[in-house]
C-alpha cells in the first residue's frame, strides 16, 4: 500500500514587503521543492498595505503537486505592544523585582513602560481581524494582550 501524498505546512515570519529568496525564505521553501521567488513576489504584493518591515507570520501550505497557498496573520502581539510604546525592543529582564514563586526576586522593579487600555483595545481590534481570533470575544482578546504586556514588563493603566 502506498502512502498518500500529504500537504506540507511551513511557518515563517517575514518582514512586510521584504520577502527575498535568501534565508529564511529560500531554504525553507527550496527544500520543499517550491520556487522561493514565486512566493516572494506574491507575498510582497499582498503585504503592500503594511508598513515595510513589519513582521508578518505566514502559514504556507505546500501541496503534493508543488503548488502552494499561504495565509498571512496579524503581526505578533509583542511587536504591536512595543510599537505602541514607540520602542524597537524591550530590555532583557522585564520583571526584575516582581514575585517569582514564593520569594521576591532581587533588584528594583523595572517597568518597560505604560500603555493605556485604549492602546490595548486598538491592538485587540487589529488581532480581531485575524481569522483565528474572529470568533473570540473582544474582552478575551484584550485579556490576552494584557497578559502578554505584563509578561513583557509593560504596565497597563486604565
UniProtKB/Swiss-Prot annotation:
SUPFAM superfamilies: Ribosomal L11/L12e N-terminal domain, Ribosomal protein L11, C-terminal domain. One of its GO terms (molecular function) is structural constituent of ribosome. Pfam families: Ribosomal_L11, Ribosomal_L11_N. The keyword Manganese does not apply. GO terms for cellular component: mitochondrial inner membrane; mitochondrial large ribosomal subunit; mitochondrion. Residues 1-73 form a transit peptide. Keywords: Mitochondrion, Ribonucleoprotein, Ribosomal protein, Transit peptide. It is found in: Mitochondrion. Its main location: mitochondrion. The keyword Translocase does not apply. It comes from the Eukaryota. Present with 3200 molecules/cell in log phase SD medium. PANTHER family: 60S RIBOSOMAL PROTEIN L12, LARGE RIBOSOMAL SUBUNIT PROTEIN UL11M. Component of the mitochondrial ribosome (mitoribosome), a dedicated translation machinery responsible for the synthesis of mitochondrial genome-encoded proteins, including at least some of the essential transmembrane subunits of the mitochondrial respiratory chain. The mitoribosomes are attached to the mitochondrial inner membrane and translation products are cotranslationally integrated into the membrane. Belongs to the universal ribosomal protein uL11 family. Component of the mitochondrial large ribosomal subunit (mt-LSU). Mature yeast 74S mitochondrial ribosomes consist of a small (37S) and a large (54S) subunit. The 37S small subunit contains a 15S ribosomal RNA (15S mt-rRNA) and 34 different proteins. The 54S large subunit contains a 21S rRNA (21S mt-rRNA) and 46 different proteins. This is Large ribosomal subunit protein uL11m. It comes from Saccharomyces cerevisiae (strain ATCC 204508 / S288c).
Amino acid at each position: 500500500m502506498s502512502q498518500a501524498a500529504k500537504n506540507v505546512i511551513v511557518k515563517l515570519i517575514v518582514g512586510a514587503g521584504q520577502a527575498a529568496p535568501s534565508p529564511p525564505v529560500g531554504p525553507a521553501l527550496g527544500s520543499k521543492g517550491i520556487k522561493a521567488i514565486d512566493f516572494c513576489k506574491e507575498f510582497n504584493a499582498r503585504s503592500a498595505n503594511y508598513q515595510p518591515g513589519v513582521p508578518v507570520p505566514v502559514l504556507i501550505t505546500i501541496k503534493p503537486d508543488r503548488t502552494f497557498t499561504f495565509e498571512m496573520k496579524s503581526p505578533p502581539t509583542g511587536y504591536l505592544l512595543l510599537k505602541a510604546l514607540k520602542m524597537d525592543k524591550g530590555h532583557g529582564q522585564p520583571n526584575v523585582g516582581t514575585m517569582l514563586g514564593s520569594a521576591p526576586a532581587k533588584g528594583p522593579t523595572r517597568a518597560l513602560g505604560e500603555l493605556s487600555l485604549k492602546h490595548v483595545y486598538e491592538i485587540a481590534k487589529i488581532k480581531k481581524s485575524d481569522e483565528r481570533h474572529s470568533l473570540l470575544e473582544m474582552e478575551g482578546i484584550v485579556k490576552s494582550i494584557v497578559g502578554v504586556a505584563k509578561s513583557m514588563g509593560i504596565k497597563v493603566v486604565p
